[in-house]
Amino acid sequence: MTQAQTAAVQPDAIPVAAPTPQRWRVADVVALFELPFNDLMFRAQQVHREHFDANAVQLSTLLSIKTGGCEEDCGYCSQSSHHDTGLKAEKLMDVDAVLEAARAAKASGASRFCMGAAWRNPKERHMPALTEMVRGVKELGLETCMTLGMLEDEQAQQLAHAGLDYYNHNLDTSPEFYGQVISTRTYQDRLDTLDRVRDAGINVCCGGIIGMGESRRERAGLISQLANLNPYPDSVPINNLVAIEGTPLEGTAPLDPFEFVRTIAVARITMPKAVVRLSAGREQLDDGLQALCFLAGANSMFYGDQLLTTSNPQSQKDRALFERLGMRASDADAMSADA
């Protein structure tokens, strides 16, 4: 066999499915990252087409229902009370205001409505309003997601009874890099909340942030952690760091955009039936790079001009990109794997 022939078959040495049931070693994930770019993209697109319509993307809208004043010290976050970002803390929004925003999101084409609160964890006094928000958004025909921080068992059950479809609680990064980003919440705290959410019967939305100064191996460590959750998340948001002034990470050098695309592809291969979502930082990607992300297996994105406290590409621009690519927005029901 010639050298060229050998090189051509090397990507096939990297398994499409997990090397052992439900297990992806960090070394296996690193091997995926290190494939030639075209080979990685081809593999990811194969996996994507096996389970999803490759030209359909779910549009999600994210609303900050309680902004600022968070007692956690996440190094990337403008809403932490530990950082001087000029953001003023606000109270929890009224239910009617949230439902008005949800109606506007639906009118603009979104099929999923996500509600985020800057808390370490919700207080019991907040639960009636939160469950009313879930019920109200569900009545509009939108898929619902919340991210409220850590949950107790009873709180997870209350949200489940209200009909919450997804709960988001990100791992943020690998266990090895985690301590350089946050000190007020442990990695195990995050895993425990995911267990409570899953036990309550709510779908898990869990991903992370890349470009915080971590190494490629540490990015692979995040993907390995996500892929080895049992089961892996139903929804995987991948955030590209937005280095916000006043946060400890404000001076972080931007990630190579092709590394971001690689991360999307590796997430698709290791979690073949998950919805992989382009999240914060999409504004830093030009149209060509976003198209590569869709080719790599991203099939959902946050849609609208604002994500919590950071900007996002305008909705009209997103619609124009879809038209140029021959892609279309899909409703929530159509995003189930193998649908």
From Swiss-Prot:
SMART domains, A to Z: BATS, Elp3
CDD domains associated with the record: Radical_SAM
InterPro entries linked: Aldolase_TIM, BATS_dom, Biotin_synth/BioAB, Biotin_synthase, Elp3/MiaA/NifB-like_rSAM, rSAM
Catalytic reaction(s) noted: (4R,5S)-dethiobiotin + (sulfur carrier)-SH + 2 reduced [2Fe-2S]-[ferredoxin] + 2 S-adenosyl-L-methionine = (sulfur carrier)-H + biotin + 2 5'-deoxyadenosine + 2 L-methionine + 2 oxidized [2Fe-2S]-[ferredoxin]
SUPFAM superfamilies with a match to the protein in the record: Radical SAM enzymes (SSF102114)
Organism: Burkholderia vietnamiensis (strain G4 / LMG 22486)
Pathway assigned to this chain's UniProt record: Cofactor biosynthesis; biotin biosynthesis; biotin from 7,8-diaminononanoate: step 2/2
Necessary cofactors: [4Fe-4S] cluster; [2Fe-2S] cluster
Gene3D superfamilies according to UniProt: Aldolase class I (3.20.20.70)
Chain residues that bind [4Fe-4S] cluster: 70, 74, 77
Name the record gives this protein: Biotin synthase
Co-factor binding details: Binds 1 [4Fe-4S] cluster. The cluster is coordinated with 3 cysteines and an exchangeable S-adenosyl-L-methionine. Binds 1 [2Fe-2S] cluster. The cluster is coordinated with 3 cysteines and 1 arginine.
Broadest EC class assigned to this enzyme: transferase
GO biological process: one example: biotin biosynthetic process
Residue ranges constituting the Radical SAM core domain according to the UniProt record: 55-282
EC number: 2.8.1.6
